[in-house]
């Protein structure tokens, strides 16, 4: 059991049976808790009539969540539907319940894909090809566009923002009161953060096409299929924090995948002009703000919060120095 996260909580055998019966009209043959999750509680389940599936159960203590985190399963399900319609390798959604009709938590069920995530995969001789396949898959995901910027569920229901800067500033404004209550930054530092993003609005608004952006492409969220003649890239999973925005947000914090093979599949190197580099630096600051709140309030990892906020302060200082030149 995960004892660090305040959001994780296992289901009873009776609850597992109730969920599978309501969602798929089947029974549990065997259930096994999957490790690694801090936000959701995840199970591999062999069913009596529907094959092998993965059940993801939303968090307890929902009062701790960031506002958009209350809608993560809806967002994830919508991204899977988008990926399916565009031929992008992703999980196959089988069931979703955000009405809390069976248990007092959201849950979704996806078809199990045999294989390993990239963190676990150890067949080094296949990695160059798989990384190129991954680059191609991410490029195809980032090529999906929308009429407005914002969280997936907001945009697909007719909302969102006309300008990229408006979405980013709305996220900063939403985060600041939570950060102050959690003592992540001082009031003065929060004002500096808001001013930094506001002053860079023209730079952000050079981005005019809202693109589907996963935002959490860690190796644990990328699956390699191992059930064929040779391993191959299998699926992008856990896109619950996705939005329509600048696809370069993918690479502001998570840069491990930027190998020559990945970039070959992605279509080339990332832009390295001053404006692009500055944007990615500010995206990293926002990403770390989200992370810091999660580390402190949800996962009880105070030292990770401190590290994240120190980097945010460094980025603000760097941006202010450049502005003064």
Predicted segments with their positions:
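Short beta-strand segments
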Residues: 56-57, 94-95, 150-153, 212-215, ...
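ATP-binding pocket architecture of kinase catalytic cores
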Residues: 32-174, 178-180, 184
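ATP/Mg2+ or Mg2+-diphosphate-binding catalytic cores
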Residues: 3-8, 291-325
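Active-site Asp-x-Gly
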Residues: 210-213, 218-281, 291
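Membrane-proximal envelope and lipid/glycan-remodeling enzymes
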Residues: 53-55, 65, 284, 291, ...
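A short secondary-structure junction motif
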Residues: 179-182, 218, 253, 290-302
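An alpha-helical support segment within catalytic cores of ATP-dependent transferases
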Residues: 9-27, 101, 124, 128-132, ...
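Short strand-connecting beta-turns/loops that link adjacent beta-strands
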Residues: 48-50, 101, 227-230, 285-288
